[in-house]
Regions:
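Activation on beta-sandwich/Ig-like modules and their edge loops
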Residues: 1-193, 200-214
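Short, composition-biased motifs enriched in small/polar/acidic residues
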Residues: 200-304
Length: 304
């Protein structure tokens, strides 16, 4: 501090500019000398903004069946905090600034939409939805996947992830009429992990609404699954398929393989297809290991 230094025998060096910026979520700063030896180290206290804590991307329609009907849905996952969206903006993927838009604050649990073309979106979904505005400067979501980044009012990163149009991302969203929906969004699910996304329950998605099926207790298998696995053989390939309920997001379904009914693993099986039926169910097809005899099971765990 200037009040205590520099004093006799001390000096202050000011260098700049440095690349990037300090994280509001806290981090460790380490000073190294020219031999990479640590000279000093300090830990910064986390001071995230409300937008960084509670704003989340909950649904993305990047390749709609109707031209121009793209949208991004955001949600305030807080139960008590209203988010001020002034100066919150998209800085990658599409261009949009909430300042002066039709929606500048977001109540607890509320959702807001940013769309590519308001006319096309209204034709597809109707009027009266909470649309903040349209993507600026002719920007649009890439059909092949891209990075989406949102900054808070201070310019710090609030949301930053990339989606793709190939497995393990939901393939039905690539022109099949479905959106991608972030599972367990209220618990802070990581949007950068493909396994945390699924196809929307119905074609067209559910802008401004949730399509989640709450778990009411009871049998986890009945909650998550709509059919038992079916094993099929074609030439040298053996597969099994099952239907699960899109929106049963509180359940984790894992396909597992064993040669002896003792040791089970999921790495030996290969997911070769996912196909929603347009009525809220999706069929997954998995391939058995080549030239192998063994057993398969589905393990269903409901998150606490």
């Amino acid at each position: 501090m200037r009040r205590s230094g520099p004093t006799g025998g001390e000096s202050r060096i000011i260098l700049g500019n440095y690349a990037g910026h300090l994280s509001n979520f806290g981090e460790t700063l380490t000073l190294l000398d020219d031999t990479a030896r640590q000279v000093a180290r300090t830990v910064l206290t986390p001071l995230p903004s409300d937008v960084q804590l509670y704003l989340a991307v909950s649904e993305v329609m990047y390749h709609p069946a109707v031209e121009g009907a793209e949208f991004i849905e955001l949600i305030n996952i807080s139960d008590v905090v209203t988010l001020d969206l002034t100066n919150v903006r998209f800085s990658a993927g599409v261009e949009f600034d909430f300042t002066g838009s039709a929606v500048t604050s977001l109540a607890p649990g509320a959702r807001v939409l940013v769309v590519r073309d308001l006319v096309a979106f209204t034709a597809a979904y109707g009027a009266g939805l909470p649309v903040a505005g349209v993507f600026a400067n002719g920007s649009a979501l890439s059909n092949g996947g891209e990075r989406i980044k949102i900054d808070d009012a201070s310019g710090s990163t609030a949301i930053n992830f990339s989606y793709l149009d190939v497995e393990p991302w939901p393939p039905a969203a690539d022109g099949g009429g479905y959106s991608i929906v972030l599972k367990r969004v209220a618990t802070g699910s990581d949007p950068g992990q493909a396994r945390n996304w699924r196809s929307s329950a119905l074609p067209g998605g559910s802008p401004s609404l949730s399509d989640v099926i709450p778990f009411g207790g009871g049998d986890a298998l009945s909650y998550a699954l709509a059919s038992a696995p079916i094993v099929q053989r074609a030439a040298e390939q053996v597969t099994f398929s099952y239907q699960h309920r899109l929106g049963a997001d509180e359940a984790e379904i894992t396909a597992e393989w064993s040669r002896d009914l003792m040791a089970w693993n999921s790495e030996a099986l290969v997911l070769i297809g996912r196909m929603p039926d347009g009525l809220g169910l999706e069929t997954e097809t998995w391939q058995f290991p080549a030239e192998s005899k063994g057993f398969v099971r589905l393990r269903v765990v409901v998150a606490p």
